[in-house]
């Protein structure tokens, strides 16, 4: 009986584990694969109507299908799913997590480290451009299907798209926890429909299956040597969203993402692309919109509705990704501090950043109004996608060779293969800069300048403050000679350098002529890892005479809640009771000068960013009624 009960319990646990795995897989489909899953809406349409000169004939269709298939297999299946997903930073993925990993890998090589940081900032900058283009091109391509169902409705495509997109951005501050539970089932339905439509098309012209032979892709390059590389600029549209597999790894883990790709997403995409190819062989006129013309007439309107929902979900994924990337960048010191609002009491990762949301919304609206169609926007899309992919490969190269210590004889050929393919896709998109691709490039340049200026400015600011800093042992020795009046309580002084006296402490002594019975010099350290366990959160050192040095360590995915962290400091001599603890902050006002380190215009830009950044009070969750802020001017 006991044995039977044990088997029953084991079976129950097994069923629970299977149900959880299936739940993670469905959730991953809803969040991770929205972008790449909506690519069939516009990819083949752009290939054959985007001015590349590809003929809608037997060889042209099979050549393009083979290129798309083998691009999906090499870039997504092999490079991302089987390789890049293993380059996690304690389970987290994405540009900033990978940059932190590459910084650690190149710690002994300052110049190489600076190059890796630069690549990371470029990749992050292009991702923000992608976060504007994805909602615009996806929703436009879905709504354009209405033009096939109703004649004369084309002029309504832009207004309807704008209504959908603006509504999406307006609901962000309320969170998407409730409707987010529907994303997975809707996207699973979407991929099933993609596959079913593909099977329907293939059944009418099975010869498209010949495109599984990579010889058709090679033949296309041989027959069209000039067009071959250029057409990669359109083929890459089938790969948009591949970066999301890596960026969202922290939410679901590598295995559910990989299983969802091989079990559902990849088969559905391949079937649909081949189905579109089949109807193009039967009717070359279908090139104007092969996705929607693949569907029977009765299914057109329901398909437009489902496609619109799928594109909204894809847009939501990149918007959430932009919020997450921004939080990581803030923690790592690349972006000024902003107000971060949590939209879910259960899910820590569900956040809202107003400044990012409204900036993205303005960018998306301008893109829709300026480009008016998904075809026109496709040129801008490829530059952002391929640039981000290329930066990811460069960062992974450093991690593989210097952190994982892979033998060069194994690593170099693999990396050369990745870089060669990424380089070809990027080169194919460079000419598009004059056709609309300038937008993500300009957006990337602006964001790169902002992030690099902030990072450099903060370093110069710390150096300037440190120049005249009084060493802490000297200060303690001086107060032993002339002891000031001590008052009850704990004074916490936030400082970037724990071995020197912060300006706020000196100003307090100068003006008030008193010291608290306990003086804590607190330094918050941002780690190159996502989370720091509680037992590694703090370091405490007692200097005597009531002075303590405390270091708090936070990862780039941790909430830097200083009062909560200080409660973990278990020392008999330290008392962090809320009503006995006062926090002293320094508020620096920057004056741009001609001193070495930063040009005048960048100094002014940094001063503007610093003035408008969220201060330590909100960022560290300090109690408003227990904070005293003292100002100081610093030249940079």
Swiss-Prot record:
It is a multi-pass membrane protein. This is Probable potassium transport system protein Kup. Its main location: membrane. The gene is kup. The keyword Transmembrane helix applies. It is found in: Cell inner membrane. It comes from Pseudomonas entomophila (strain L48). It catalyses: K(+)(in) + H(+)(in) = K(+)(out) + H(+)(out). GO terms for cellular component: plasma membrane. Keywords: Cell inner membrane, Cell membrane, Ion transport, Membrane, Potassium, Potassium transport, Symport, Transmembrane, Transmembrane helix, Transport.
């Amino acid at each position: 009986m006991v044995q039977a009960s044990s088997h029953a319990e084991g079976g129950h646990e097994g069923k629970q584990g299977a149900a959880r795995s299936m739940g993670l897989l469905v959730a991953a489909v809803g969040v991770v694969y929205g972008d790449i899953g909506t690519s069939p809406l516009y990819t083949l349409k752009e290939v054959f109507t985007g001015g590349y000169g590809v003929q809608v004939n037997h060889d042209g269709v099979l050549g393009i299908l083979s290129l798309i298939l083998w691009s999906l297999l090499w870039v997504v299946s092999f490079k991302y799913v089987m390789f890049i997903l293993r380059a996690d930073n304690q389970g987290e993925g994405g540009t900033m997590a990978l940059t932190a990993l590459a910084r650690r890998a190149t710690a002994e090589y300052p110049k190489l480290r600076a190059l890796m940081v630069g690549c990371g900032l470029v990749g992050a900058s292009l991702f923000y451009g992608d976060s504007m283009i994805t909602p615009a091109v996806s929703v436009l391509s879905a709504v354009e299907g209405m033009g096939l169902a109703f004649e004369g409705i084309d002029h309504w495509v832009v207004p309807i798209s704008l209504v959908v997109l603006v509504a999406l951005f307006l609901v962000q501050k309320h969170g998407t926890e409730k409707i987010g539970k529907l994303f997975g089932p809707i996207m699973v339905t979407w991929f099933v429909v993609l596959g079913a439509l593909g099977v329907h098309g293939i059944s009418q012209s099975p010869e498209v299956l010949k495109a599984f032979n990579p010889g058709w892709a090679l033949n296309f390059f041989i027959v069209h040597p000039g067009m071959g590389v250029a057409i990669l600029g359109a083929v890459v549209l089938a790969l948009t969203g591949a970066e999301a597999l890596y960026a969202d790894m922290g939410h679901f883990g590598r295995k559910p993402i990989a299983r969802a790709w091989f079990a559902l997403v990849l088969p559905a995409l391949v079937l649909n692309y081949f189905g579109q190819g089949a109807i193009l062989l039967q009717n070359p006129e279908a090139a104007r919109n092969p996705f929607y013309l693949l569907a029977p007439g009765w299914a057109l309107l329901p398909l437009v509705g489902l496609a619109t929902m799928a594109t909204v979900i894809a847009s939501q994924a990149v918007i959430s990704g932009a919020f997450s990337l921004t939080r990581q960048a803030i923690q790592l010191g690349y972006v000024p501090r902003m107000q971060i609002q949590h939209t879910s009491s259960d899910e820590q990762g569900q956040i809202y950043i107003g400044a990012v949301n409204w900036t993205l919304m303005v960018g998306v609206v301008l893109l829709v109004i300026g480009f008016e169609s998904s075809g026109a926007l496709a040129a801008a899309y490829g530059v952002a996608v391929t640039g981000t992919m290329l930066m990811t490969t460069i960062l992974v190269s450093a991690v593989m060779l210097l952190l994982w210590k892979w033998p060069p004889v194994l690593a170099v050929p693999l990396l050369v293969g990745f870089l060669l393919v990424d380089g070809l896709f990027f080169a194919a998109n460079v000419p598009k800069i004059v056709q609309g691709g300038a937008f993500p490039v300009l957006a990337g340049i602006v964001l790169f300048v902002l992030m690099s200026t902030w990072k450099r400015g903060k370093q110069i600011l710390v150096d300037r403050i440190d120049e005249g800093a009084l060493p802490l042992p000297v200060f303690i020795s001086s107060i032993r000679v002339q002891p000031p009046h001590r008052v009850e309580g704990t004074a916490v002084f936030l400082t970037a350098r724990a071995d020197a006296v912060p300006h706020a402490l000196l100003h307090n002594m100068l003006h008030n002529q008193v010291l608290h019975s306990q003086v804590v010099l607190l330094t918050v350290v941002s780690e190159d890892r996502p989370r720091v366990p509680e037992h590694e959160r703090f370091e405490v050192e007692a200097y005597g005479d009531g002075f303590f040095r405390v270091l708090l360590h936070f990862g780039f995915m941790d909430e830097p809640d200083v009062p909560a962290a200080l409660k973990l400091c278990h020392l008999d001599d330290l008392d962090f009771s809320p009503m006995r603890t006062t926090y002293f902050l320094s508020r620096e006002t920057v004056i741009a000068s001609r001193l070495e380190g930063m040009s005048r215009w960048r100094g002014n830009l940094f001063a503007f960013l610093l003035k408008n950044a969220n201060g330590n009070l909100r960022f560290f969750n300090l109690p408003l009624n227990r904070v005293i802020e003292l100002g100081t001017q610093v030249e940079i």
